[in-house]
């Protein structure tokens, strides 16, 4: 294997000794040679045999591909008539729905920018995002409109028509239904949109600090679309995906509102996750792919006998898990209970447009604990966080990524951008990883989540894995607890299994027998559940706040 500069690259690991870069072993993505193309046009121009684009799992209401593209054109026509121009920011506050992609695709086709927000956010959190991103218009559903009532933004209601009660109290300018019924106009004001122009402004989860706006370009999204096509790329329109992941999140947005449309796939959308609704939808619509996060996969595993007896899941070919690597026990337990279903895994960040690494078949997933191999056209470095030295195979350091899906930067935040992306385009992920001799990435821990005990570094993930191996523990999280003498020590939050009377001393003794003295857990609190974000990652900062509030 050789890269473009003719440096010799090890075919097995993808590592190049001369520049200390790991290169992807996957086929590279092809980007359009025409630079004046937006992601909506790129997706809509692809040929496939798909018939139905989106189905609402609850109501059965659907959009065919012709209906989808007509709706996108109609909404874009109305937005243009309202004065929406290239570079304007549009806020979308909505749960998953078949109309979510219509709004996104219409906005981006004009060169305007979509910014999404979590429907569970408080009015204060949404107001903060509005102040930062400065949208000129908002789309939302009637049930959520009160959350942006104080913003004075003009609002389009995602409904068939506007109820008179809303019009009296808010600045409601239209309904999505009304806009979709508009005849598309070929004469609307058009702006030349380039691949480098901004398409989305998504706010990262902020698990390591204040939430920041991630600026992604049309090129980033087109590269994401091409990566998804390379993974699921049959263009026969025969795949059916269940969408349980939130569309306001980068993976939900890029995969379900964009990428999978290019292959003619049908996407069955759940407005919110409910396991019975999800399983019923798989059975009813003969779904072939189920993207999910590890907690849902664990629920499928724990209730396997009941689920197999009640639901026909014979159409299901693969589950796609993201958020955290799966253990050997989970993978083999799942394969044993669902022998016709493959497990695929993925790793990515909002800053990398949801792309970074993946396993693309069960054989790759059986490299237990891996996040996968580098995505197409992605390059990586493993960097010693203390010295800045780039490391080789099987050495642990911070994972840096570079490729066509890496964000442009953080919105109006040059300081955060320059501390995250260097002058050569390398994104510092904040994840401690190593890449093995076959090119598989293993995430060891979050760099910023390391506990410093008397100068020693302790990885919470290592202790969490040990805690989860205890027969009476169903979930656990480890955080740094401040200590005058040691600086910090490991504290565990533990969820007991039903009927367990596990004590703090028993938990501490259990870990003490398994780790070096500096890694020992020195405080335990028992809780009903561990707080996690929508992708299944532990909200460690919430637990740290809980622990330190009692000091």
From Swiss-Prot:
Positions contributing to ATP binding: 204-212, 345-350, 431, 443-446, 537
Region called SBD2, residue ranges: 346-410
Protein's cellular compartments: Cytoplasm, Cytosol
Superkingdom of the source species: Eukaryota
UniProt EC number: 6.2.1.-
Assigned keywords, A-Z: ATP-binding, Cytoplasm, Ligase, Nucleotide-binding
Tissue: Mostly expressed at low levels in glandular trichomes (lupulin glands) after flowering, and, to a lower extent, in stems, leaves, cones and flowers.
Region (SBD1): 274-345
Single GO MF annotation: ATP binding
Listed InterPro entries: AMP-bd_C (IPR025110), AMP-bd_C_sf (IPR045851), AMP-binding_CS (IPR020845), AMP-dep_synth/lig_dom (IPR000873), ANL_N_sf (IPR042099)
Gene Ontology CC annotation, any one: peroxisome
Domain notes: Both substrate-binding domains (SBD1 and SBD2) are involved in the substrate recognition, and are sufficient to confer the substrate specificity.
UniProt record similarity statement: Belongs to the ATP-dependent AMP-binding enzyme family.
Protein name (record): Probable CoA ligase CCL5
Upper taxonomic lineage: Eukaryota, Viridiplantae, Streptophyta, Embryophyta, Tracheophyta
């Amino acid at each position: 294997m050789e890269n473009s500069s003719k440096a010799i690259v090890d075919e097995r690991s993808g590592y190049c000794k001369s520049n200390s870069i790991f290169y992807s072993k996957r086929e590279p993505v092809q980007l359009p040679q025409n630079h004046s193309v937006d992601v909506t046009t790129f997706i809509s121009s692809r040929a496939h045999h798909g018939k139905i684009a989106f189905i609402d799992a609850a109501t059965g209401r659907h959009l065919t591909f012709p209906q989808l593209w007509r709706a996108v054109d109609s909404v874009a026509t109305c937005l243009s008539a309202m004065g929406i121009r290239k570079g304007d920011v549009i806020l979308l506050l909505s749960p998953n729905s078949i109309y979510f992609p219509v709004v996104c695709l219409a906005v981006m086709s004009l060169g305007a920018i979509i910014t999404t927000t979590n429907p569970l956010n408080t009015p204060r959190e949404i107001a903060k995002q509005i102040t930062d991103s400065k949208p000129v218009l908002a789309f939302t559903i009637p049930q959520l409109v009160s959350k942006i009532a104080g913003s004075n933004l003009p609002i389009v209601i995602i409904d068939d028509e506007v109820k008179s009660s809303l019009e009296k109290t808010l600045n409601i300018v239209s309904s999505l239904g009304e806009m979709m019924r508009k005849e598309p106009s070929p004469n609307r004001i058009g702006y030349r949109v380039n691949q480098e122009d901004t398409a989305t402004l998504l706010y990262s989860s902020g698990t390591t600090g204040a939430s920041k706006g991630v600026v992604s370009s049309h090129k980033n999204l087109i590269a994401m679309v091409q990566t998804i096509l390379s993974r699921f790329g049959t263009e026969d329109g025969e795949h059916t995906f269940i969408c349980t992941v939130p569309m306001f999140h980068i993976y939900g947005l890029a995969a379900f509102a964009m990428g999978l449309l290019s292959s003619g796939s049908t996407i069955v959308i759940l407005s919110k996750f409910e396991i019975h609704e999800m399983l019923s939808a798989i059975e009813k619509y003969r779904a072939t792919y189920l993207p999910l996060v590890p907690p849902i996969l664990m629920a499928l595993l724990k209730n396997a006998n009941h689920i197999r007896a009640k639901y026909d899941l014979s159409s299901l070919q693969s589950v796609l898990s993201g958020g955290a690597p799966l253990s050997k026990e989970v993978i083999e337990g799942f394969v044993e209970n669902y022998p016709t279903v493959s497990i695929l895994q993925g790793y990515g960040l909002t800053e990398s447009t949801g792309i970074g690494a993946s396993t693309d078949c069960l054989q790759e997933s059986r490299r237990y604990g891996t996040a996968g191999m580098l995505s197409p056209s992605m390059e990586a470095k493993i960097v010693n966080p203390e010295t800045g030295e780039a490391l080789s195979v099987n050495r642990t350091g911070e994972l840096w990524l570079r490729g066509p899906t890496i964000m442009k930067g953080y919105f109006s935040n040059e300081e955060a951008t320059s501390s995250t992306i260097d002058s050569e385009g390398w994104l510092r992920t904040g994840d401690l990883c190593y890449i093995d001799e076959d090119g598989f990435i293993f995430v060891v821990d979050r760099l910023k989540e390391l506990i410093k005990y008397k100068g020693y570094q302790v990885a919470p993930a290592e202790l969490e894995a040990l805690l989860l191996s205890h027969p009476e523990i169903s979930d656990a999280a480890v955080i740094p607890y401040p200590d005058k003498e040691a600086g910090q020590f490991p504290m565990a939050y533990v969820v007991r299994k039903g009927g367990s009377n596990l004590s703090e001393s028993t938990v501490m003794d259990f870990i003490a027998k398994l780790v070096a003295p500096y890694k020992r857990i020195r405080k335990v609190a028992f809780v009903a559940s561990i707080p996690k974000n929508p992708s299944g990652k532990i909200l460690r900062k919430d637990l740290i706040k809980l622990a330190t509030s009692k000091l």
